[in-house]
Amino acid sequence: FFQAVFGPKNVAVKGAANLAGKTIGVTRGAIEDMELTKIAPASADVKRFEDNNATVSAFVSGQTTLLATGASVAGNMMARNPNLSAEYKFVLKDSPNFIGVAKGEDTLRLKVNEIIAAGKAAGDLDTMAKKWLGRPAGDLPN
C-alpha cells in the first residue's frame, strides 16, 4: 500500500513542486498529513479534515483540487466517482505489507516466499497492484 496525491487528469502534478498554488485535501494527523507537510511548498493550500470521509467529500465536491490519501481510499473514491477522471499523481510514502509466519515454520516461510517470487517474476503482482492500487508493486524485497 502507499499514500499518495491524487487529482484530475487535467491537472498536471508530477511531484511536490507542482503543488504550489493548489488546494490539497488531507485527513488531519494521518500519515499523508505528516508526509505532505514535509514537502508542500509554502504556496500550497493544505486543507485538513477530521476524517477520510470528510476529506474525500471535499475533493469530490470540488472544495479541493487534489487529494492526499491512501491508495485504498483513493481507489474506492475513483471507482464511485468515475466522472471526476481522478488519477494517481505521485507517492508520498510507501507502506509495505508483510506476511508473518510462526518462528520455526521454515517450510511454510519458504513456500510463501516461493509463491511471491513466482508472482513477481511472472508480472502477476504488478498486474494486481495496477488494478487495485493504480500503480505497479514496485521494488519488492527478495
What spans do the regions from the language model cover?
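Beta->alpha turn/N-cap motifs
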Residues: 1, 8-9, 29-30, 51-52, ...
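Periplasmic-binding protein-like
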Residues: 1-7, 75-117, 135-142
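Flexible hinge/capping segments at coil-to-helix
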Residues: 7-24
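Short helix-initiation/N-cap motifs at beta->coil->alpha
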Residues: 11, 47-61, 93-95
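Short helices/loops that flank or line small-molecule/ion binding pockets
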Residues: 17-20, 38-41, 53-68, 72, ...
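Short amphipathic alpha-helical coupling segments at ligand-binding clamshell hinges
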Residues: 18, 70, 104-118, 124-128
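Short, well-ordered beta-strand segments
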Residues: 23-25, 67, 100
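Ligand-binding clefts/hinges and TM-proximal coupling segments of bilobed small-molecule sensing domains
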Residues: 31-48, 86-88, 117-142
